[in-house]
Amino acid sequence: MRRPILDKLSLQRYNYVNELAVVITIQNVGGEKDMAKKIVVYHGSSKIKEKPIWGVGNPNNDYGLGFYCTESIELAKEWACSTETDGYANKYELDLSDLSVISLTSGEFNILNWLFILLENRKFRISGGIAKQAKEYIFDNFSVDYKSYDIIKGYRADDSYFSFATAF
């Protein structure tokens, strides 16, 4: 994700979350000729995030360093309260004009493309020859140039998915 995207995010409101438990709705703005798109996304956090800061976070997350959002306010609440503490589901509106978007959930990609991205970003130890061969095969046959896009829309691995990826 390139830094200018974060400047386009504007905090709309936030919801206080006091239970354990980011929605992307794409809307056409204007007439058919004006296909500018705005999306609403949520970011779960222990803090109110008026303006996201680039470069903060874990570079070993699924898609690397970035500001992770979701289409689901419920999922944002879950992310906000992952350690049995209260948190916030920050809501943002983002104008997609002039931004490049890759959707890993489109028919153009499959689960092995996503697995390539996980293998590239997550840190774990690969032991055994077959595991190393499998990783090499995925890198050779299912690589995706996702780093050149402003927005990556795709799956998010929780620990059970990552266990699958590690086992693979």
Per-range role (PLM):
Residues I39-N60:
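Short aromatic-glycine-(Arg/Gly/Cys) micro-motifs in beta-strand/loop hairpins
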Residues N90:
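Catalytic core of tubulin tyrosine ligase-like
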Residues D7, R13, V17-K37, N61-D62, ...:
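Conserved NAD+-utilizing ADP-ribose enzyme module
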Residues V41-K47, G64-T70, A165:
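Short linear motifs at secondary-structure transitions and domain/linker junctions
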Residues N58-T83:
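Extended catalytic/binding region for NAD+/ADP-ribose chemistry, centered on the ART fold
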